[in-house]
Amino acid sequence: MRVEFIEMIVVGESIKPILVKSKVYGKSSDVKHGFRVGRYRVWSKRANALVWMWADHCRVIEE
């Protein structure tokens, strides 16, 4: 399984969360607090770093 983040909140060093509309993909193994719940740690090409994504801003894709 993988997760497709369509609109996600990138929690970084900035005080205000950034809303990103580009698609970022992550594996289900990136889940930290249960599948489809909590936050995902995903690599972002745009940020060129690992970032936290909230699960309620994504949908799960069956592989």
Residues covered by each model-derived region:
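Structured surface patches comprising rigid loops and adjacent beta-strands/short helices at the edges
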Residues: W54-E62
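Basic/aromatic-rich interaction segments and small domains that mediate binding to polyanionic partners
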Residues: R2, I6-A55
